[in-house]
Design a protein with these regions (language model features):
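N-terminal cationic and glycine-rich segments that engage phosphates or anionic surfaces
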Residues: 1-102, 106-431
Length: 431
């Protein structure tokens, strides 16, 4: 693998893409420590040291690489974009116009991307307002009496909202730059960077905690086992054989070859985990407005925001399973695949072309997605439950969702680098 990295850096074009990607990640991390105007940075550091564990905005802070608790320019991280993407993809099912745009190809996709950007900015305004309110009323730093935002004037508030919203827009642009000019999916790599940046501090915290080295070693063993399981399942696939009939075009014979359709156990990747985690944060964010003593807000904090609450865990599992089926359905269309196969003379042995092929593919996808969704839910829950049992807390970046995202994004990025190496006749990473 190291030799493959050396070959990658010896290729000028690939080296330029890798360095560009790393450079954007560095810029992203620098922005995570730039304080927002109006925030007292020394007071923020005091509150971080003194505040109690807070699971209300734990996931947002994790996906922002700790920028949320720093109240930095990039406080919101990538979460507004993730939420906007969820809404736009849901609207594709409800609004025929959106589905028609998706089928129009590049122009339609560009239009949907534009809608996602607009919605991201709107959500960023809402979420930045929520963050400012929670910081002022003490919810962001429970147990800390120091004012992190000394000036509560309307001008300062508007300046902070504009700054955080602009930071979200800049993050979105940086992610798109990586996708266009770098290596891998830009948004996924920024999430990867945010989560990975929290690992060293979390490991140090666990090792120095009440459990000591023993708890640290047990947690590391669990993480290694979960990573091995994730890599094994993510690389597994069912191959549906496809044969192409011979056909004459002029004097030449085409077709007659055999290939296969690779069907992964987890076709949706880490998207269901991200979507489920994001949706569960919405009630907690809305609860940040208004009177914090209201009964329903206390109920939300105890049952939905707390990651170790039974209701939170149950909804988390159900949402992961739902989004597994939902995302698989919108990314793999059996009817479209069957039509393309029929158009080019392809068929599955023992299955008639056309509608029977589409029904067979749908049958296979439905049954493969079932264990895939259960696998995702288990991987997302096992580390969290283990951490609760060991008493090390749940607000650490080693949860199942974090491991799934880091490993999933890492595998996809390595595969993309490998494919570019193979195009240049080099040996790839995966042998």
């Amino acid at each position: 693998m190291l030799s493959a990295f050396v070959r990658a850096f010896r290729t000028p074009d690939l080296r330029r893409k890798l360095l560009f990607t790393v450079g954007i990640m560095v810029v992203f991390r620098i922005g995570s420590f730039l304080p927002t105007p109006g925030v007292s940075y020394p007071n923020v550091q005091v509150c971080i040291d003194q505040s109690e564990s807070n699971s209300l905005l734990g996931l947002v802070n994790l996906f922002s690489g700790g920028a949320l608790l720093q109240l930095s320019v990039f406080s919101l991280g990538i979460m507004p974009y993730i939420t906007a993407s969820i809404i736009i993809q849901l609207l594709r099912v409800v609004i025929p116009r959106f589905e028609a745009l998706h089928k129009e190809g590049q122009s339609g996709t560009a239009k949907l991307t534009q809608y996602t950007r607009y919605l991201t900015i709107g959500l960023a305004v809402l979420q930045s307002t929520t963050v400012i309110i929670t910081a002022r009323n003490g919810q962001l730093f429970p147990g800390c009496s120091v004012d992190v935002i000394p000036d509560d004037s309307i001008v300062t508030t508007l300046l902070m909202i504009v700054t955080m919203t602009a930071g979200t827009g800049l993050i979105m642009w940086l992610g798109e730059l990586i996708t266009e000019r770098g290596v891998g999916n830009g948004m996924s790599l920024l999430i990867f960077t945010s989560i990975a940046a929290s690992f060293p501090g979390a490991m140090w915290s666990i090792a120095g905690g009440s459990g000591g080295i023993g708890a640290f070693l047990v947690i590391m063993a669990i993480i290694v086992l979960v990573i091995a399981l994730v890599v094994f399942v993510e690389q597994s696939q069912r191959r549906i054989p496809v044969q192409y009939a011979k056909r004459m075009v002029g004097r030449r014979t085409y077709g007659g070859s055999s290939t296969y359709i690779p069907i992964k156990i987890n076709m949706a990747g880490v998207i269901p985990v991200i979507f489920a985690s994001s949706l569960l944060q919405v009630p907690a964010l809305l609860a940040g407005f208004g009177d914090q003593t209201a009964g329903w807000k206390q109920w939300v904090a105890n049952n939905l925001a707390a990651t170790d609450a039974p209701l939170h865990i149950a909804l988390y599992v159900l949402l992961i399973i739902f989004f597994c089926y939902f995302y698989t359905a919108i990314t793999f269309n059996p009817d479209e695949v069957a039509d393309n196969m029929k158009r080019y003379g392809g068929f599955i042995p023992g299955i008639r072309a056309g509608r029977p092929t589409a029904e067979y593919l749908d049958y296979v996808i439905t049954r493969i997605t079932a264990p895939g969704s259960i696998y995702l839910a288990l991987v997302a829950l096992i580390p969290t439950i283990a951490f609760i049992v060991l008493g090390v807390g749940t607000n650490i970046p080693f949860g199942g969702s974090s491991i799934l995202i880091v490993v999933g994004v890492g595998l996809e990025t390595v595969k993309q680098i490998q494919s570019q190496l193979e195009q240049r006749h080099y040996e790839g990473f995966l042998r």
